[in-house]
From Swiss-Prot:
Protein residues bound to Fe cation: H759, D761, H816
Domain Fe2OG dioxygenase, chain residue ranges per copy: 741-834
Name of the coding gene: ORF1
(+)RNA virus helicase C-terminal domain ranges (all copies): 1112-1247
Listed GO MF terms: ATP binding; ATP hydrolysis activity; dioxygenase activity; metal ion binding; mRNA methyltransferase activity; RNA binding; RNA helicase activity; RNA-directed RNA polymerase activity
Protein name as catalogued: RNA-directed RNA polymerase
Keywords: ATP-binding, Dioxygenase, Helicase, Hydrolase, Iron, Metal-binding, Nucleotide-binding, Nucleotidyltransferase, Oxidoreductase, RNA-directed RNA polymerase, Transferase, Viral RNA replication
Residue ranges of domain (+)RNA virus helicase ATP-binding in the record: 957-1111
Note accompanying the cofactor annotation: Binds 1 Fe(2+) ion per subunit.
Names of required cofactors: Fe(2+)
Ranges annotated as biased composition (Low complexity): 635-652
Any GO BP annotation: viral RNA genome replication
Alphavirus-like MT domain span: 59-232
Length: 1729
């Protein structure tokens, strides 16, 4: 261990170790990246160790597998080395290499590199993805000829070539200076050895050659011939080349004579030197150079250890060890024989021990046998030398005896042979095996030429003449094979100069042409070009003295007019403009060819009266003229357009007509006239080509179709389904000046020679006057146009980036066809005026007809650009975002809205880091979003880290390990890091994230997206279906995980302050950061007042200085809504605004506070706060307006109002919307005030209340015998004395435990005359407050009341729309209340005359104690007296008025099937509902679930706890059903001004006020559904404050936020729903056989009534309550336990004793065997009912 490593090991602190580990990881990460680039595979350990020795690392965490991963890693390393050798700025020719491997060479595909990939083996078709070139010779070297770059690279193909092939390449490629070549040849094959690297590859010798199998996989093996091993020792290649030069010698001045031609032949030497660059295993990299001077004389290769060959000491020679042996093995075996005198078997065992299992397979049995014999042989020799030692020398011995002895030994050895020791020495003369070779210098036959080159040249020449002159037929690949011409030319070609052979081939082809078509001369423009560059020259050139008319009659163009002007081609392209501007800038004569009949056009000539020469631009725009007005017989100047390359003469047309055909059809304009496709448009077109997903294959072309209004495009038998419209298409249309009417975009990719026959593009989906625009993106193509009238035709050769415009009317007059001349040619075709577009698009989207525009002109939005736009120079960037930027829009105050704002000119940009992919880099740079250098603010980072460590912020981070948190803080104290950062600010829907999503969704990038909320996280995942979802992380999870090199922070303003600084400081792996956000929207807010980040500036404030500009545009909101917000929008239409007092379900609800979000969310609404909805887009949005709305910041309101795309519904949860105070509050919120002014109230849908049919129940009885004499014995023993149980007050003691009967004293008797009890009751039941305090409480609890109403509405399935008021139902409710009052006795009515006094104020009331015996089971035999119940006596008219309102709401409110309210119902009705019986007691499906515990809830002081929240809930309930507002206001006034004799009462429920029972029940439902998660499958029973559910609900997590605002205190109880433990509801038990009365409570009442003498008055009621249990007979034992059965027996016995003979157990009583029979009996007439 080194000193430094030893010192670092002394740090044992985990935090310090973590810091050291992070620093080490930071330093080693670039190395790991380089390792993965070369070797991304999972390599076996043994192979990984070998690769590491060879200089190739292996990533320990790699999981990628490959059949021969080690050799693949070596191949990548070779390519990596080649990448360092290739010139960076110059083009390179790549031979036999796939384009996908350019990334290993670190070369961008956009460079002008050339690929030559010959098809030699069949699998090359799959490897290169190309079909064989028809012009390619069968010989592999024929495709390598004519390399036009100075440097070339040939991958793993050199071993297939001979030295002559390589010389051919250099001879035919004079520009080629250096050829870098890699090949795979194992050097050990030169000695027939096994693999030197068996973990990397194996070698199998077979059929006179050998197979090289990477990783031992013969399925991937390559077969090599022995002669290919020559390349391992190739040093130079030499060839003598004979060149013939011809010079014309003129006679000297003054001498007569003729000039003569001198032919001189010279011989030059072509010498190529070869040098090895590197060798890794069997992979070698060589460089061949023509300008070198020498190469090393000896070349050595690695031998992976020391090897030796054993001497051949046995006869015959074949009986010796033939293959080399590792020297360490040989030495080991030799020393073994020295140490032990082994037997032959011992030697064999030792040999077996020295070879591994896998090595044994490499040796034949003969080899092993020979080795064993050799080792045994040396073992039998003498080990001790018999030579004299020099230490014993003396003078005599040295000079006399030693020479004599030496001569004797030599003679003896010569005659008798050597002794054993000499034999041993001979046997041990091992020869070391090395791979050192003297390089070989190859010399070639000087006149050799391949026959295949001759055949290829002949085909190239004939095919060229076929294309350029049409005077000979094209030749197929094998058409010339075996022809007589070829045989004649190949005669004696091995001894002839190659140039003479090629010339003879060319002359022979010309001789075969028709006599009248031969040219007198053919020249080659470039001596280094191939046969395609031969151009025909017309012998009869027009004279310079010809006039315009004569020049116009020239039929054949000159060579000069057909050669590209190199100077013009180098001119920079002009600024792109609209197509109309291009058209207007044409030269007058050129425009005349489009706009005037041919008879009126004037010819154009140059100054010397010669036809003006035209130049073919690249790229260029080709306009097809208006054919409908052409005069085929007109004769006009040829100068109006350049002549085409070829004119096809129709046999039916006169020659004169054919002369002007090309001029009339096609006009080309030079770049000087500005009519070319702009570089920006070309870039967009290429980007569109890269994004295109081809869906259909037709013949030899692939097709993709895009449209916004058409589902498909059909022609003939083919149909293409439309794909989603890409944003880049919009940008390309804008760049080309095309309007939105160009709705069809057809993209096609052609194979070479693919054809589309003559057609007119007149499908039914197009209008007859539609226009066609075609971009020829890649490659060349022949475009044929044929006139319908006379079948005259013309062919245009479309070149790279050409544009073709076919005007309206061409579908009627002409047809066209296309033939691809290039493999992979791509065309993009736009068509306008589709019928689907005209039918579906808005009128303002149609193309604008401009005055004076001809039929063929293209017009659109760009033709109506407003003048003097302040943002004129920003329009290209707006176009990339999908905006035209040509409209002037104003905000509500009339101010001009700028689409680009907050422009900064002081930005200092830095280069993009390498981790940013090229396409994304280009788009960001084009949008002006280049990165800036940002240095982390460690102070901000440390503040957030401290808050995280001390659990002041975050939820997930609070559970992190303390060590990790401490490490987080320590990182913030280190030196700050700096990262390149791109900040993108824009309005919601501006597309600031769309660019990133488009790139990330189609590329595998090392990037993570960090978002502030889960809602935004899901939004990203939904939009990027191809992107791994786990890479979209919330900010807390991202902080705890490792980070990639590139990080995107979306909506970064909602991240905690300092988060970005902390993230970059804690993750040093981050190399590039992209921030997207909106400076106008809400930002992060920390609720913890102790958090340090509360005092930090927001992220927006910190990073907005690094944003170049703000995109104040939106695609989300329609123009009216966007303009109200001060945002630019081109989305037409009107946003729908509505207003109401109810919250609708199904759409996003935005609320002002987090409490409201929790409450409304638990009520079933999809809810977000104003500030928390950032990043969400929805068609419809609801915005809640309450008393917290005006407290919201403008940024919060802006965020909320900008979410909707179609509809905003304002939900008012405040009473008195139209009050002046409310409007004053709205003035505090300017955004909302703008919207409220444009809203009208909606009408509610009408609903009819449901009607209920009430059936009268009856009962029968039955009971077995039980003993109940001691039933109350235990209770009576525990009973205290009366004096100890009464309560004493200033008015004396209470008197609730009366008489001396112990049974009676178990029950409290509460009476109004008990003054002491009245004092206790009033103190507990009544609370006093002022009217102002009640109003303040009501306002403070509006939110809670709204939450109660929303949950009640959800539970009762009340429609969202307000229900109209039903007058008839109201009057019926009033009549029922009046009838109930009048049904009282005259005495009762007379006693209430004071309450009927009209002068009695409505809010005044009397309060007195309710008289009752307390028989409730929970209050049986209490140790002390408890407070009683109060009765509030309001004015009778008030009670009847609000009683009618309560009855109306009860009738009109829907009642879902899972909820039953015990009002106007009998126990049998509830039993039928719970057990699923129909009206005829037939079982259907049981609803109540008895397989799980039941749940009951009661309340402590329920009436007194119904405060302002419950009152607001009642008001919302009444308002939703359109109860007259005056009545609602009166009810609110009464509740807040209720006045008892001692003063105003607080807001509470008062028994006797009218709606007591209905309001209590509704408040109970609302409270329980607000507090608990109660599913629809849960059956529920309610009656006042009593409630029973058939399952135990789960409390909502958000209830704790509003629990403190409620006075209600619930008492819950869980029932197991087993024997004796059934759910209790209003003293009834829910059993599997229906409701039965609690037998103990019923028996207590009977005992009390019997003791006080009231049993005879109440016996009928008790009998009815006992009947359901009595009817169960034997099933009663399934319901009651022992104690309960005793109580039931006592009840039945007492009823029988009191004369209820129907309860006797006679045999005539019905025996019910099933549930249906039980209830049928219960429904029968009962005599006591």
């Amino acid at each position: 261990m080194t000193t430094l490593a030893l010192n670092l090991a002394q740090y044992n602190d985990p935090i310090t170790k973590g810091i050291i580990a992070q620093e080490s990881l930071r330093r080693v990460r670039p190395d790991l990246k380089a390792v993965v680039n070369v070797n991304p595979y999972a390599i076996p350990t043994s192979a990984a160790l070998v690769l590491e020795k060879l200089g190739i690392g292996t990533h320990p965490m790699s999981l990628a597998v490959h059949p021969h991963a080690p050799c693949k890693a070596i191949e990548n390393q070779i390519l990596n080395t080649v990448g360092h050798l290739l010139p960076k700025e110059q083009p390179v020719t790549f031979m036999a290499m796939k384009k996908s491997k350019l990334n290993m060479l670190r070369r961008h595909p956009s460079r002008a590199d050339t690929f030559i990939n010959p098809i030699y083996h069949p699998r090359d078709n799959v490897r290169y993805g190309l079909d064989p070139d028809p012009d390619q010779d069968a010989s592999i070297t024929a495709s390598f000829l004519e390399v036009k770059t100075s440097t070339a690279f040939m991958q793993d193909t050199l071993h297939y070539l001979t030295p002559e092939d390589l010389l051919d390449i250099f001879e035919t490629s004079p520009k080629l200076e250096n050829l870098i070549a890699s090949f795979v040849l194992p050097v050990e094959a030169t000695r027939n050895m096994k693999s030197l690297y068996p973990d990397l590859y194996s070698i199998h010798y077979t059929h006179g050659g050998f197979q090289w199998a990477p990783s031992g996989h013969l399925g991937d093996a390559y077969f090599h011939e022995p002669w290919q091993l020559y390349w391992l020792r190739c040093g130079s290649l030499t060839r003598l080349i004979e060149e013939e030069t011809t010079t014309t010698v003129q006679p000297p001045p003054g001498f007569e004579g003729e000039a003569y031609t001198r032919v001189r032949k010279e011989v030059r030497e072509l010498k190529i030197y070869a040098e090895r660059v590197t060798s890794i295993g069997a992979h070698h990299l060589f460089i061949f150079s023509r300008n070198a001077k020498a190469t090393p004389r000896v070349r050595s290769y690695s031998q992976n250890g020391k090897w030796v060959t054993l001497p051949r000491i046995f006869r015959p020679v074949s009986h010796n060890v033939q293959t080399p042996l590792k020297q360490e093995v040989a030495n080991s075996l030799m020393l073994y024989t020295y140490a032990v005198r082994p037997s032959l078997k011992d030697v064999a065992a030792k040999v077996r021990q020295k070879f591994d299992e896998k090595d044994l397979a490499e040796h034949s049995p003969l080899e092993i046998t020979h080795l064993i014999n050799y080792i045994y042989y040396i073992d039998q020799r003498a080990y001790l030398t018999n030579d004299d030692d020099i230490l014993s020398d003396n003078l005599l011995k040295r000079w006399i005896f030693t020479p004599i002895q030496a001569a004797y030994k030599k003679a003896k050895g010569f005659l008798l042979g050597p002794d054993d020791f000499q034999k041993l020495l001979k046997a041990l003369e091992w020869q070391p095996v090395t791979f050192d070779y003297a390089v070989d210098h190859y010399k070639s036959n000087p006149w050799r030429i391949h026959a295949s080159r001759t055949g290829a040249k002949m085909r190239q020449l004939k095919n060229f003449l076929s294309r350029t002159t049409g005077l000979c037929e094209a030749v197929e690949d094998d058409a010339l094979e075996g022809s007589e011409l070829l045989k004649e030319l190949e005669g004696n070609m091995w001894f002839r100069n190659p140039s003479e052979v090629e010339k003879e081939v060319f002359d022979a082809i010309v001789a075969d042409l028709p006599p009248d078509s031969q040219r007198s001369e053919l020249i080659l423009e470039d001596p280094n070009s191939n046969a395609r560059d031969y151009l025909p020259i017309q012998q009869d050139q027009p004279s310079v003295t010809q006039g315009p008319d004569e020049a116009a009659q020239t039929q054949t163009p000159t060579a000069t007019s057909m050669v590209t002007n190199s100077v013009a081609a180098r001119m920079p392209p002009p600024v792109p403009r609209t197509l109309r501007e291009h058209h207007e800038q044409f030269p007058t004569t050129v425009r005349a060819s489009f706009e005037q009949p041919s008879s009126t056009r004037a010819p154009e000539t140059s100054e010397n009266n010669t036809p003006a020469e035209s130049v073919t631009p690249s790229p260029r725009a080709i306009y097809v003229g208006d054919f409908a007005i052409m005069d085929a017989n007109a004769s006009t100047s040829r100068a109006s357009s350049p002549s085409p390359r070829r004119t096809v003469v129709s046999p039916r047309q006169p020659e004169a007509q054919n002369e002007t055909l090309g001029r009339q059809i096609v006009s080309r304009v030079s770049p000087a006239h500005g009519c070319q496709m702009s570089p920006y448009a070309a870039q967009l077109a290429h980007q569109l080509s890269e994004q295109t997903a081809y869906t259909d294959v037709i013949g030899q072309r692939m097709v993709a179709f895009y449209s916004q209004h058409s589902r498909s495009y059909k022609y003939g038998r083919h149909e293409h389904r439309s794909q989603s419209w890409l944003p880049v298409i919009d940008s390309l249309q804008v760049a080309l000046g095309l309007d939105e009417s160009y709705d069809h975009c057809l993209i096609q990719r052609y194979r070479k020679h693919a054809r589309v026959g003559l057609h007119a593009d007149d499908e039914e989906c197009y209008e007859p006057d539609s226009t066609i625009v075609t971009l020829n993106l890649y490659g060349n193509a022949d475009f044929l146009i044929e006139r319908n009238t006379d079948k005259a035709s013309e062919t245009i050769t479309l070149q790279h980036n050409d544009m073709l415009f076919m005007p309206s009317g061409m579908q009627v007059t002409h047809r066209h066809a296309v033939c691809s001349l290039y493999e992979g040619r791509v065309s993009i075709t736009f068509r306008n005026k589709t019928k689907d577009y005209l039918r579906k698009s808005a009128p303002d989207m149609n193309p604008v007809e401009q005055p004076g525009a001809s039929a063929g002109q293209l017009t659109g939005p760009l033709d109506h650009r407003p003048e003097e736009l302040p943002w004129e120079h920003w329009i290209p960037r707006l176009n990339r975002l999908g905006f035209t930027g040509l409209q002037k829009q104003t905000d509500p105050e009339g101010k001009l809205i700028y689409p680009i704002t907050e422009i900064r000119q002081d930005m200092v940009y830095v280069p993009f880091p390498n981790c940013c992919p090229g396409p994304l880099r280009k788009d960001l740079e084009a949008m002006g979003r280049r990165p800036v250098r940002y240095t982390v603010d460690t102070g901000r980072a440390l503040t957030l880290a401290s808050d995280i460590k001390n659990n002041r912020v975050g939820a997930l981070l609070q559970n992190a390990d303390l060590t990790w948190k401490t490490l987080l803080v320590e990182y913030c104290r280190m030196e700050p890091t700096s990262v390149p950062m791109t900040v993108i600010h824009g309005a919601g829907g501006s597309g600031k994230s769309k660019l990133l999503q488009d790139h990330l969704n189609r590329a595998e990038l090392n990037v993570v997206i960090i978002v502030p909320t889960r809602v935004l996280q899901q939004d990203w995942r939904n939009k990027m279906t191809e992107f791994p979802s786990f890479l979209v992380q919330t900010y807390e999870a991202a902080m705890m995980e490792s980070a990639p090199q590139m990080v995107v922070f979306d909506d970064y303003g909602k991240l905690p302050h300092g988060y970005i600084d902390l993230f970059c400081q804690f993750h040093p792996s981050v190399e590039y950061v992209i921030l997207t956000g909106d400076a106008r929207q809400s930002t992060y807010y920390e609720y913890n007042s102790d958090a340090g980040i509360r005092n930090l500036p927001t992220n927006i404030e910190v990073f907005k200085q690094y944003c170049g500009y703000y995109i104040n545009c939106t695609h989300r909101n329609k123009q009216d809504l966007a303009n109200m917000l001060g945002v630019y929008s081109e989305k037409m239409g009107s946003t729908h605004f509505t207003f109401g007092n109810t919250c609708e379900t199904g759409s996003l609800l935005l609320v002002p506070s987090g409490t409201q979000k929790t409450v409304m969310g638990e009520a079933g609404h999809k809810t977000e706060t104003y500030a928390g909805c950032q990043g969400i887009t929805a068609d419809k949005v609801q915005i809640m307006i309450d008393h917290d709305t005006h407290k919201s910041a403008d940024s919060h309101m802006y965020t909320a109002l900008s979410r909707a795309t179609e509809h905003i519904h304002f939900y008012n949860s405040i009473a008195g919307l139209n009050t002046a105070r409310f409007h004053a509050k709205l003035n505090l919120t300017p955004y909302l005030k703008t919207f409220i002014q444009v809203i009208t109230e909606r009408a509610a849908a009408e609903t009819e209340p449901a009607e209920y049919t009430v059936q009268a129940p009856t009962a029968r009885t039955h009971i077995p015998v039980e003993n109940c004499s001691t039933f109350l014995e235990k209770d009576l023993e525990e009973q205290r004395a009366k004096e100890d149980r009464e309560v004493y007050t200033q008015a004396g003691a209470t008197n609730v435990f009366q008489t001396n009967s112990p049974i009676v004293q178990c029950f409290q008797h509460q009476q109004p005359k008990d003054g002491a009890l009245s004092i206790i009751t009033h103190a507990k039941r009544l609370q006093y407050a002022s009217a102002e305090a009640n109003q303040a409480e009501y306002r403070a609890k509006l939110q809670i009341g709204a939450a109660l109403w929303e949950n009640f509405k959800t539970a009762m399935e009340i429609p969202d729309e307000p229900v109209p008021f039903i007058r008839d139902l109201w009057e019926q409710s009033e009549a029922e209340v009046l009838s109930t009052y009048l049904s009282k006795s005259e005495m009762a009515i007379k006693n209430g005359k004071n309450r009927q006094d009209p002068d009695w104020q409505d809010e005044r009331m009397f309060v007195y104690l309710k008289a009752q015996w307390v028989t409730k089971a929970s209050k049986f035999n209490l140790p002390t007296a408890k407070a009683g119940q109060t009765i509030s006596a309001f004015k009778q008219a008030v009670v009847m008025k609000f009683g009618a309102m309560a009855r109306y709401l009860r009738r009109i409110t829907p009642k879902p099937d899972n909820i039953r309210i015990n009002c106007e119902m009998q126990p049998q009705d509830i039993s039928k509902w719970a057990l699923g019986l129909d009206s005829h007691n037939r079982p259907t499906k049981q609803k109540w679930n008895f397989e799980r515990p039941a749940f009951a809830s009661d309340f402590e002081a329920f009436d007194q706890s119904q405060d302002g929240a419950m009152l607001h809930f009642e008001a919302l309930w009444a308002r939703h059903f359109n109860v007259p507002s005056s009545l609602i206001e009166e009810y609110l006034f009464l509740k807040m001004h209720a006045q008892a004799p001692k003063g105003y009462l607080t807001i509470m429920r008062l028994t006797g006020e009218g709606p007591t029972f209905d309001a209590n029940t509704a408040c109970s439902i609302a409270y329980n559904h607000t507090r608990y998660e109660i599913p629809k499958s849960c059956m529920q029973l309610y009656a006042g404050d009593d409630m029973l559910l058939d399952q135990v609900p789960v409390e909502k997590t958000g209830f704790k936020n509003i629990a403190a605002g409620l006075k209600l205190t619930a008492k819950t109880e869980i029932f197991e729903q087993k024997r004796g433990k059934w759910g209790e509801f209003c003293s009834w038990w829910m059993t599997p056989y229906g409701l039965v009365k609690d037998p103990i409570t019923l028996y207590h009442r009977i005992l009390l009534a019997s003791e006080i003498g009231d049993l005879s008055k109440k016996i009928d009621a008790y009998a009815i309550e006992a009947e359901p249990a009595y009817a169960l007979q034997g099933r009663l034992f399934d319901c009651f336990n022992e104690e309960q059965m005793t109580a039931h027996y006592g009840t039945i016995r007492r009823l029988i004793i009191e004369g209820k003979t129907n309860f006797s157990l006679d045999d005539q009583a019905p025996r019910h065997q099933d549930l249906q029979g039980i209830l049928n009996c219960m429904d029968a007439k009962f005599m006591y009912h």
